[in-house]
Amino acid sequence: MAKAKFERTKPHVNIGTIGHVDHGKTTLTAAITKYFGEFKAYDQIDGAPEERARGITISTAHVEYESENRHYAHVDCPGHADYVKNMITGAAQMDGAILVVNAADGPMPQTREHILLGRQVGIPYMVVYLNKVDQVDDPELLELVEMEVRELLSSYDYPGDDIPIVKGSALAALEGRDAEIGENSIRELMKAVDDYIPTPERAVDLPFLMPIEDVFSISGRGTVVTGRVERGAVNVGDELEIVGIRPTKKTTCTGVEMFRKLLDRGEAGDNIGALLRGVERDGVERGQVLAKPGSVTPHTEFEAEAYILTKEEGGRHTPFFANYRPQFYFRTTDVTGTVKLPEGTEMVMPGDNLKFEVELIAPIAMEEKLRFAIREGGRTVGAGVVSKILK
């Protein structure tokens, strides 16, 4: 059978299921595909293949489905460690998440951890599915659990009072019984996701930014920098800034090339060469970014959420301590930095995830949600995301 082609006419949104182990994330994912996509059985989702992101192996299942209004790409991870790695590396960017909570248990440790991670890595919106409601006989108990979930969300700066909470049974939906808590709850959930999680801005509509990968000098023309446009678009004649590592410098783009052809513009996703006016060959280097003036600023100190690889994943064999000095790989280059551990943390073991502060020896064009790798001599030993800029 030929693969059905998804019509790209609908706006696209990336979401995923998060929550405590065994609260029903994968069952819910399977149930959604039953009513809105190409049906995937529990085992097909649970046996997620391993993939690599920033040198880290993660198991993630990807499913696609569509509501009346939108097309969704949905991620589900088999294990808790996979969630942590996935959220920190941004291997699967999420525009919003469905938090699954077992109504009989209420919020559990990983429920809390996933909400905290969501806040740290910048998942902007959450919708709650209160699962297994058929295991709770007392409606007052159900109300208490709902209140508890709302308070927990609010304590991590999510608007707990406004977040939609849908009650149901993913298993009933998957087995096609008890429509009230089964199929109807899935339809209600997707309506909540449609209405509450906004369509993200397209990358091409954001301010222009291109990490510089290489620099060439073309005799008689000037200096060309190459790279893949991360977001936005650049037109010939645009004023730009070169940001990071050295003092910020203004320039003008006098030409855009792609595959040796001259273009009027380059946009998100394109690999381009940009010809820059008045910039010497040694006045710009890999690791800087080319950006719309004022849209991004250079920083040296930030707070990060990071995951440290285990020995089995090719990471360190030993813990590290305060004032650890690895390299931080941002976009296209390594910059050395010093780690400041949170109070009460003496050492960090391989396999840990934690929040810490970093001071870099040179400024990098940076904003919240920017991902990086932690490296020692070119070997990846961890992954992180900027959760807050300090200086």
Curated annotation (Swiss-Prot):
Region: G5, residue numbers: 169-171
Coiled coil regions in record: none
Pfam families according to UniProt: GTP_EFTU, GTP_EFTU_D2, GTP_EFTU_D3
GO cellular component terms attached to this protein's record: cytosol
Domain tr-type G residues, every copy: 10-201
Recorded catalytic activity of this chain's protein: GTP + H2O = GDP + phosphate + H(+)
PROSITE patterns in alphabetical order: G_TR_1, G_TR_2
EC category name: hydrolase
Keyword tags: Cytoplasm, Elongation factor, GTP-binding, Hydrolase, Magnesium, Metal-binding, Nucleotide-binding, Protein biosynthesis
Known partners and oligomeric status: Monomer.
Family statement: Belongs to the TRAFAC class translation factor GTPase superfamily. Classic translation factor GTPase family. EF-Tu/EF-1A subfamily.
Protein's name according to its UniProt entry: Elongation factor Tu
